[in-house]
Amino acid sequence: MKTLKDLGDLKGKRVLVRADFNVPLDGTTITDDGRIKAALPTIKTLREEGAKVILMAHLGRPKGKVVPELSLAPVAARLGELLGANVPLAKDTYGEDAQAKVAAMNDGDVVLLENVRFNPEETSKDADERAAYAKKIAALGEAFVSDGFGVVHRAQGSNYDVAADLPAAAGLLVEKEVKALSKATENPERPFTVVLGGSKVSDKLGVIENLLDKANRLVIGGGMVFTFLKAKGYEVGTSLLEEDQLEKVKGYIETAEKNGVELVLPTDVVVNAGFPAGDTPVAPEVVAADAIPADKMGLDIGPESQKLFHDKIVDSKTVVWNGPMGVFEVPEFAAGTKAVAQGLVDATAVGAFTIVGGGDSASAVRNLGFPEDGFSHISTGGGASLEFLEGKELPGLKVLE
């Protein structure tokens, strides 16, 4: 994979950087700026080299139309604060305003182009249409840096097709992500523990299949665990259940046994009368995993399982975690996710290599107040880190080879 140093001297050069600024917004307020901060090392390095830094990114799903609420204006403002420099936002991605703002740049300046997904061609399935659009963006720059790890699993105009038109390389964030995820999956120091959560088994099938013969231990929680418990013959009440995945999950349980992979499931769960909605009071109670009442829904792993999961994680040299253990946004159902996060922090402190997969696990870690440096690596890619863990070839990385 080509990296920044492969681009040579960038002084005075216009460098297009595809970043991942898909941040959560509350109106125009950014509620988690982790992805913006993750892009800073690449932006600062390019500025120090005297490059003109032209940033592009998407926000939300405007579906090819201009949606004012999904403008990157809040991102430009936050970036300016973090860099201590003015970051003008172009009104378009490659049109007159973008061209004018780029033409006015001095060495070391930073400009942000408007949301690439305001253009229907960005996500078009028609390769020719995407390529023609990418050429218009590429015309703004003289080199391309791919630094949006959150989109490398997609072949889209601004991260895949642009790379064909300009000298292209991975930015520091993409390089760091690939190094960390490769270190965990290609030659992990053992014991290697994979912790999976989140609501659906169907989202994690590929990861389980790819890691069942690599991991020493698979720890499972979150909504997806009830399909495992049901596959073991337990009743799961009104908990989330994917009936159509039961046979597959039974197969995984058998394969784990056959491969000598330790499969760790919760022994107790926290249940409630239903999914917590609005101001409805919750009445959490702890029950054994094999004794979930018919009218109750499991929403977190119980205290006994929290200790079990924590201890299994600490007894590891490599840990990859993807997906929360429960409905962590509701304090009564956050303890399981906290216990797992604490397990990773404690394992890291005694020398383990730990990765928090992107998406919900990364927001959980931040929202629950854990220090980012308590983990070896927090991935910025939800789907991208999952597909990497599935062993898939990612189009946005392939174009940088």
Curated annotation (Swiss-Prot):
Its EC number is 2.7.2.3. PROSITE patterns: PGLYCERATE_KINASE. One of its GO terms (molecular function) is ATP binding. The keyword Cytoplasm applies. One of its GO terms (biological process) is gluconeogenesis. Substrate binds at D20, F21, N22, R35, H58, L59, G60, R61, R117, R154. Pathway: Carbohydrate degradation; glycolysis; pyruvate from D-glyceraldehyde 3-phosphate: step 2/5. Belongs to the phosphoglycerate kinase family. Monomer. This is Phosphoglycerate kinase. It comes from Bifidobacterium longum (strain NCC 2705).
